[in-house]
Amino acid sequence: MKTLLTTTLLLLTLSFYAQDAKEIIRKAEEKMRGKESAYTEMTIEVIRPKWTRTMGLKSWSRGNDYSLMVLTEPAKDAGTAFLKRHKEVWNWVPSIERSIKMPPSMMMQSWMGTDMSNDDLVRESSSVTDYTHALGKDSIIDGKKCWKVILTPKPDAAVVWGKVVAFVDQKDYVQLKAEQYDEDGYLVNEMLGSEVKEMDGVILATRLELIPIEKEGQKTIMTINTIKFNEVYDDAFFTVHNMKNIR
C-alpha cells in the first residue's frame, strides 16, 4: 500500500511539472502571438561573412492556425507573400503571378535565403501541441533567472527538430534563448532574444538572433519595429485571394 501511494504521488508530481512546463511555453508563445491575434512589422537582416541583406516584413496572425506574411522590401521581392490556414501553407510569387501550395517536405528548407526554415516563419508545427515538455535546471541568461524547458517531439508530430531547449525568463515569460537540435542530438541553431521592452502593453524581446552553430560569421537578425495585439481578423482575411493583394 505504501509503495502504491508513493508511486501515485510520484506520477502526480511528474504530471504537475509536465503541465507546468507546457504552460510556461504557452505563455512565452503568447508574448509574440497575443492571446487572440497579432500584427507585426519587422526588419530582417541576413548576415554572411562577405555580404548583408535587409528585408522588411509585415505579418498578421490569429491563434496558431492562421497567419499571413508579406515582404515589403527590397523592391524586387515586395509583395511576395506566405499564407497559413490550419495545416495548409501557400506562397505567392508576384514576379511570375503564381501561388504555390507548399508540401510538408519544404518546411525544412531555408526561407528566402535566411537561417530560418519555412517552418520557423509560418510555424506549421506548434511548440505547445506538437511536443512534450519537461523542466530542466534553472539557468541565468543575461542576468535573469530562467526556466529551462526541454521540448521533445511527439511520435506522430511533423516537426523539424529532434529536440528544442528553451530558456524563459521567470519574471515576464520572455524567451531569452532557444537551442535547436537535430534528430541525432547535435546542436544546429541558437536563438537569442534581447532588447526586452514593452510594446502595446506586453513585455517582449524585440530583437531575435538566429545563429547557426557550425557556420562562422553567419546569422539572421529579426527586429520588431511595430506590434499590435488582439486586432480582429476574420477567416476571409486569411485566403489565397487576399494573399495576392495584401501590401
Where are these regions (language model features)?
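Short hydrophobic/aromatic-rich beta-strand segments that constitute the beta-sheet cores
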Residues: 40, 67-71, 89-93, 99-101, ...
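Flexible, processing/modification-adjacent segments and terminal tails
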Residues: 19-37, 43-46, 52-53, 78-81, ...
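Short, exposed beta-strand/loop patches in secreted or surface proteins that constitute
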Residues: 57-61, 81-82, 136-138, 194-196
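N-terminal, post-signal-peptide region of Sec/Tat-exported proteins
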Residues: 42-76
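Hydrophobic h-region of N-terminal signal peptides that target proteins for export
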Residues: 9-18
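Positively charged n-region of N-terminal signal peptides that target proteins for export
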Residues: 1-7
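Gly/Pro-enriched, hydrophobic low-complexity segments
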Residues: 18, 122, 142-239
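Residue-level signal for tight coil/turn positions that link beta-strands
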Residues: 63-64, 86-87, 200
